[in-house]
Amino acid sequence: MSDSAGLIAHNWGFAIFLLGVVGLCAFMLGLSSLLGSKAWGRAKNEPFESGMLPVGSARLRLSAKFYLVAMLFVIFDIEALFLFAWSVSVRESGWTGFVEALVFIAILLAGLVYLWRVGALDWAPEGRRKRQAKLKQ
């Protein structure tokens, strides 16, 4: 038996499954376009708000601080993922893996200290921070 015939014989179940999924999706899309309503109007292009016409704009202006917090969350979440993977294989990696994990943590801590020193993690406006510092003295 040739390689291509063996590959086809081995994966025929997956091919039938894939054809079934594509066929079911095409059937559901076709049925919804046939049976769905065809009415067009101004309200069709508006977002649904409990049957009420929308008032104002849906765009919200967010402070850049929220994006900074989201980026820090992603960075430290990935750090936790890498450290979890390291902790699973700590016996196999030995002291070399331990030193590599320490270097990884040190680099991330250096970045965190830099952000802290620059003031990227300060949420209060500078004037309010100065007033609070004067009150504490």
Curated annotation (Swiss-Prot):
The UniProt record lists the keyword Transmembrane helix: yes
Spans through the membrane: 12-32, 66-86, 95-115
Enzyme class (EC, first level): translocase
GO CC, one annotated term: plasma membrane
Reactions catalysed: a quinone + NADH + 5 H(+)(in) = a quinol + NAD(+) + 4 H(+)(out)
GO function terms (MF aspect): NADH dehydrogenase (ubiquinone) activity; NADH:ubiquinone reductase (non-electrogenic) activity; quinone binding
Pfam families listed in its UniProt record: Oxidored_q4
Entry keywords, A to Z: Cell inner membrane, Cell membrane, Membrane, NAD, Quinone, Translocase, Transmembrane, Transmembrane helix, Transport, Ubiquinone
Keyword match Transmembrane: yes
Topology of this chain in the membrane: Multi-pass membrane protein
Places the protein is found: Cell inner membrane
Chief localization: membrane
Superkingdom of the organism of origin: Bacteria
EC number(s) recorded for this UniProt protein: 7.1.1.-
Gene3D superfamilies: NADH:ubiquinone/plastoquinone oxidoreductase, chain 3
Subunit structure, interactors included: NDH-1 is composed of 13 different subunits. Subunits NuoA, H, J, K, L, M, N constitute the membrane sector of the complex.
HAMAP family according to UniProt: NDH1_NuoA (MF_01394)
Family note: Belongs to the complex I subunit 3 family.
Function in brief: NDH-1 shuttles electrons from NADH, via FMN and iron-sulfur (Fe-S) centers, to quinones in the respiratory chain. The immediate electron acceptor for the enzyme in this species is believed to be ubiquinone. Couples the redox reaction to proton translocation (for every two electrons transferred, four hydrogen ions are translocated across the cytoplasmic membrane), and thus conserves the redox energy in a proton gradient.
Protein's name in the database: NADH-quinone oxidoreductase subunit A
